[in-house]
């Protein structure tokens, strides 16, 4: 059984700027500030370069796993809670379906182009047909429990994490990749712009 290594990467601003044209080309036709922040995080992470316990490290793994789909299937976005507040679980169900329907055009193409630029293949476990079918068969209240304050999003996943002994992780609030990696702050203009604003001309 293989162990897991936490590879910590630190991308200097100058390096970010030097790769910006490449990232924009790969993510096009997506061109929003949010898309750029996500694409940049995926681009640098998929290089597999960084440090493990302070020692330089580069992975030779060719297959990457992506968590794409978990938010769309299990109500992980803030707008899902907003939909629930507006119209209860019926409104939430419609919002989840809308997000799931647009994954191919909004996310998959962008992510696949960016990740494959480093000669790696990506797998999407949450988008496996059986996983999607199973989650779609469940009542939405089993997937999201917004009566809880911060931890009602992705409720089913949090329950599973707790069952597997990942109690600490199960209690953490969600952080989007662009905020968890700080990629949203790499571009001075983008840091103060709305995520839906256009970052560049596609």
What are these regions (language model features)?
Residues 4, 51-54, 144:
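Intrinsically disordered or highly flexible coil/loop and linker segments, enriched in small
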Residues 56, 60-202:
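Mid-to-C-terminal catalytic subdomains of enzymes
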């Amino acid at each position: 059984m293989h162990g897991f290594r936490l590879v910590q990467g630190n991308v200097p601003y100058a390096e970010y700027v030097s790769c910006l044209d490449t990232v924009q080309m790969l993510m096009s036709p997506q061109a929003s500030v949010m898309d750029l922040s996500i694409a940049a995080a995926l681009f640098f992470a998929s290089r597999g370069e960084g440090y493990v316990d302070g020692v330089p490290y580069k992975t030779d793994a060719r297959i990457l796993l992506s968590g794409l789909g978990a938010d769309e299937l299990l109500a992980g976005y803030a707008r899902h809670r907003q939909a629930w507040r507006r119209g209860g679980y019926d409104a939430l169900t419609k919002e989840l379906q809308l997000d799931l329907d647009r994954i191919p055009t909004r996310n998959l193409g962008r992510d696949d182009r960016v990740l494959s630029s480093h000669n790696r293949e990506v797998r999407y476990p949450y988008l496996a047909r059986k996983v999607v079918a199973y989650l779609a068969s469940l009542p939405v209240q089993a997937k999201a429990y917004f009566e809880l304050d911060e931890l009602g999003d992705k409720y089913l996943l949090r329950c599973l994490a707790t069952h597997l002994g990942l109690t600490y992780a199960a209690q953490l609030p969600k952080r989007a990749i662009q905020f968890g990696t700080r990629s949203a702050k790499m571009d001075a203009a983008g840091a103060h712009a709305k995520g839906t604003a256009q970052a560049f001309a596609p």
